[in-house]
Structures are given as structure tokens and as C-alpha cells.
């Protein structure tokens, strides 16, 4: 009896916009985790949908009191996060973000409950899927060295692959420290994750599948990167990261998004950081692949090192 592990409470944040076709699957995935629903709150924010997304949510909310629906004017993903933060909607120990077309895996909360050791930020693994079959597992755990826990992170130690929020859990107190995100723009999830990471005192990596990421849904932001405006938005995010001296995540995003990289080459855009990109926190295979891609794709040409200027002024995220 004395050794029984007390159960953590969880908040699931779901931004929703015109996803009536998919949101039922998201809601049911939370219900079907097998975790005590009294210890879960599912915060669903309808970001000005013009379809019947809210009607679908209301039907579930009548049956399941852990579901909380909020409606607001459209301001995109960043606007939803600002709304949740500024209205203090999170009440539980840990929170995670599950977009309305994505899903939580079974037993995900039990796994976090087992492995969390009062860490501020927890990274899990996730599946990329097409809505029917699981495409392939993404083992985030293996992007890092064998150590499970990192404490007191320094800017230069931020690992390369931290720009996806799937399977990521964070303390509510950490979430409330994040500055407002930019509204009406795509790709604010990567910026938010940088904020979380920089403010976390303890980060844990759990080699468990915690989410399903519907990466091939039509009009998914990851599928419209070839759109010129999307390229410019992502470029703006990278320039913001450069201000905070985050060369490694910038490098991995440039490696991953070919169109963005070519745009930077064409327009002679370079990123100035006091440190050069490195992949030292990844395991050997990932580290070798990243270095190879970094030079083979010419990404190394997009960086210019700046000298460190002594200043007492603190940069606030």
C-alpha cells in the first residue's frame, strides 16, 4: 500500500479548426488510453471553425465531463496557445498538445506516470501515420545520447531534433512561463518548444510511443511547405532562433526542408550565431548522418559566426 505510485493528472490541449472529420478520433484516443478520466482534462479550443467541429465536440462533452470546449476567433495555432495560457485553462500536473487530427496512444498517460520524476519537460516517441495505418515509428529517444535525463541546459547543448511537439509533456508551470507566440502564422510549435526547452531545468527522454502524428493529412502545415508564403514564415522562425543562438535546430530544419534551404541559398541569406551547429547530443549514427547531410547539402554555407559581445542586458524569450 505504501509503495503505490500516486497518479499524476494530465491536461490535453487540442487546437481545432475545420476538423470535424478527424476530431472524433482525437477525442476517443484520449478516452481509450485506459487512464482514469477523472484525472484528465481535455481542453479543446475551436479556433473559429466554419464547419461543424464544435457540434462534434459538444456531443462528446455531454457524455464525458472531462472534455472542455472553448470557442474563439481564428488566430491560428499560436493564437490558441496564447488563449490557453492567458486564460489559465490548464489545471493539472502535466500537459501535452494533441492537434485535432492527431491521437494519443493507449497507455500513454500510464507511461508518463511511471517514468516522470518531477521533470519539467518530457520527450517521448511517436508514430507518423496516414490516418489508417501506422507509417513508421519516430524514436526521438535515439536522437539523443544514452543519458535519459539532462539538467540545467545551456543554449549550445540543445539537441537538433526538438521542433516537433508530438509525445511531449510539460509541467503547467513551465507552460505559463512561455511568452506569447505570434498569431496567424504557421510553424509556431517549433518556437514554443524552444521556449519550453530553454526554461526547463530538467528534461527527460522516454523511449515509449506516446502519440500518432497524422503527417499526410491534406492541408497539414508539414505538407504545404512548398507554398512560398509558408517558406517565408518558416524562415522568419529560423531568424528568431538565430537571435537566441540556436544553430543546431536551425541546421536540422534547413537540412530537412529542401525548398527553404534553396531559398536561403538563392537570396544569400545567412544565420549569425555565436556558436557553430553541432550534433553532439545525438547518438553516433544520428550524429554521423547529420554531419554528412550538413556538408553534403551545403547547409554549412548558410551560417556565419558572430563574435560574442559582452553585455549585461538579458535576452528575454
Task: State where each predicted segment sits.
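Short, well-formed alpha-helical segments that are part of the catalytic scaffolds
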Residues: 19-33
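A conserved acidic beta->alpha catalytic loop
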Residues: 29, 46-55, 99
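Glycine-rich, basic loop-to-helix element that forms the pyrophosphate-binding segment
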Residues: 72-90
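Conserved nucleotide-sugar donor-binding catalytic segment
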Residues: 148-227
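Membrane-interface aromatic/basic loop that binds lipid-linked glycans or pyrophosphate carriers
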Residues: 265-317
Amino acid at each position: 500500500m505504501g509503495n503505490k505510485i500516486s497518479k499524476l493528472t494530465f491536461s490535453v490541449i487540442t487546437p481545432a479548426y475545420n476538423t470535424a472529420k478527424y476530431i472524433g478520433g482525437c477525442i476517443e484516443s484520449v478516452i481509450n488510453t485506459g487512464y482514469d478520466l477523472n484525472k484528465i482534462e481535455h481542453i479543446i479550443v475551436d479556433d473559429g471553425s466554419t464547419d461543424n467541429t464544435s457540434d462534434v465536440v459538444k456531443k462528446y462533452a455531454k457524455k464525458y465531463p472531462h472534455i472542455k470546449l472553448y470557442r474563439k476567433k481564428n488566430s491560428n495555432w499560436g493564437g490558441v496557445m496564447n488563449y490557453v495560457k492567458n486564460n489559465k485553462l490548464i489545471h493539472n500536473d502535466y500537459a501535452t498538445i494533441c492537434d485535432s487530427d492527431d491521437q494519443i496512444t493507449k497507455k500513454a498517460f500510464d507511461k508518463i506516470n511511471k517514468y516522470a520524476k518531477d521533470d519539467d519537460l518530457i520527450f517521448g516517441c511517436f508514430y507518423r501515420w496516414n490516418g489508417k495505418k501506422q507509417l513508421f515509428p519516430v524514436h526521438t529517444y535515439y536522437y539523443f545520447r544514452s543519458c535519459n535525463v539532462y539538467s540545467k541546459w545551456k543554449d549550445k547543448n540543445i539537441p537538433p531534433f526538438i521542433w516537433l511537439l508530438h509525445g511531449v509533456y510539460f509541467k503547467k508551470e513551465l507552460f505559463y512561463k512561455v511568452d506569447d507566440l505570434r498569431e496567424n502564422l504557421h510553424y509556431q510549435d517549433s518556437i514554443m518548444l524552444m521556449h519550453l526547452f530553454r526554461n526547463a531545468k530538467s528534461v527527460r527522454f522516454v523511449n515509449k510511443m506516446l502519440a500518432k502524428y497524422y503527417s499526410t493529412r491534406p492541408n497539414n502545415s508539414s505538407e504545404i511547405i512548398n507554398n512560398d508564403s509558408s517558406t517565408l514564415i518558416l524562415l522568419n522562425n529560423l531568424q528568431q532562433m538565430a537571435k537566441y543562438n540556436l544553430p543546431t535546430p536551425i541546421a536540422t530544419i534547413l537540412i530537412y526542408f529542401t525548398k527553404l534551404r534553396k531559398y536561403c541559398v538563392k537570396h544569400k541569406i545567412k544565420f549569425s550565431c555565436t556558436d557553430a551547429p553541432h550534433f553532439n547530443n545525438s547518438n553516433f549514427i544520428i550524429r554521423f548522418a547529420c554531419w554528412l547531410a550538413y556538408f553534403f547539402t551545403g547547409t554549412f554555407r548558410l551560417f556565419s559566426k558572430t563574435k560574442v559581445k559582452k553585455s549585461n542586458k538579458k535576452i528575454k524569450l
